Amino acid sequence: MKRSSRGFTVAELVMVTALVAILASVAVPTARFTMKREREAELRLDLRLMRNAIDDYKRLADQGMIQVEVGTEGYPKTLEELAEGVPIVGQLTKRKFLRRIPIDPMTGKAEWGLRSYQDEMNSDSWGGQDVYDVYSLSGGTALDGTKYKDW
């Protein structure tokens, strides 16, 4: 009597399961690394956009195109001012420097650490006079070992 066997043996199932587990153990850390690298690239871009907007505002203030209070350094008072727009001397419309305040990809919030021109370099507290620099409020560490707040 000939018996035809259909299906898989237990050994075959164990081998396939082990192979899938090995592949998954390699794929998950690689995916996490890739996602973190993408968020870091987005953070760099967002910081660059905001810093360029601050620099553009300062340049126009120094040229007298934006009215600033006497005794101030010519930087915006808030990030919101960059997104809402400011009146330009001799023009009817406001000039916007940012479309919107970006969301920090590390914290998931549109909240950023701020430094004013009068603050100490690398200070973690904002004096509130103006916005001279921005940084991430994330306490995390980047792939290169630096802290996000130091970027």
Task: Name every feature range the model reports, one short phrase each.
Residues K2-A31:
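N-terminal single-pass transmembrane signal-anchor helix
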Residues L13, R37, G128:
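Exposed loop/turn and edge beta-strand positions of beta-sandwich/beta-sheet ligand-binding modules
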Residues R32-K36, I66-Q67:
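Short helix/strand-bridging catalytic loops that position acidic/His residues to coordinate divalent metals
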Residues A18, A27, M35, G90-T93, ...:
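Short, functionally important structural connectors and interaction interfaces within domains
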Residues N52-W151:
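Low-complexity, acidic interaction segments enriched in glycine
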Residues M35-D62:
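Membrane-proximal N-terminal amphipathic helix
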